[in-house]
Amino acid sequence: MSELSKALRERAEDSILQLRGAVAEFKNVCYANSLGSESSVLTDLIWGAVPQIEIFSIDTGRLYPETYELMERVQQRYGRTLSIYYPKTEDLEGWVGEHGINGFRNSLEQRRGCCGVRKVEPFRRAISGRSAWVTGIRRGQSASRATASPVEWDAEYGLHKVSPLLEWSENEIWEYIRKKRLPYNSLHDSGFPSIGCAPCTRAVQPGEGERSGRWWWERGDSRECGLHPRRQMGFSK
């Protein structure tokens, strides 16, 4: 990491220590790669220094083409394979048959139901049997994430949640990506600081929050897909 500034190198080394600590303390640690900018950093840290951590992604079936392209570039860069989880066909067919392909726009309940089928259920399968999962959340992303702790008990899923990038700023994320010339989602160059499913993510305007382009038709700052529900944490370290 000689190409990094001293401050950023120390930041990265601290995150690696957190990842190694998670591997030492918990069994079968995994990382949920969302294929955003934070994922570029964490994938590099994990596959470069803590390869025991399995990295997986969820293909909801409605991702941007640029996101699928990134999957390929990441695997080519590191010579490793991402584990990909998909929605269950019968669940997806049932939900679309009842609500329509874009039924998530009808109400908050239906949007959460769509996220549940396309993302949360595959995620539950991915973490089954695990004792900890790694996330790329940062305090600066939203008010609901600002109070998170580096290691928390995730009562929703019954395992620990480790967030080694919690203290990183957006500028630090991008400095790391550029200095190490990491593959990243090209949508970031078009005003997308946060990227999810294509129908539910748009570019943000100057001065808007990092996650304001996610489910923009909904009100409130705590718009989440369900992987990081609020008030789910029992205790923290």
Pin down the residues of each PLM region.
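Nucleotide-activated chemistry modules centered on ATP-dependent adenylation/adenylyltransferase
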Residues: 1-237
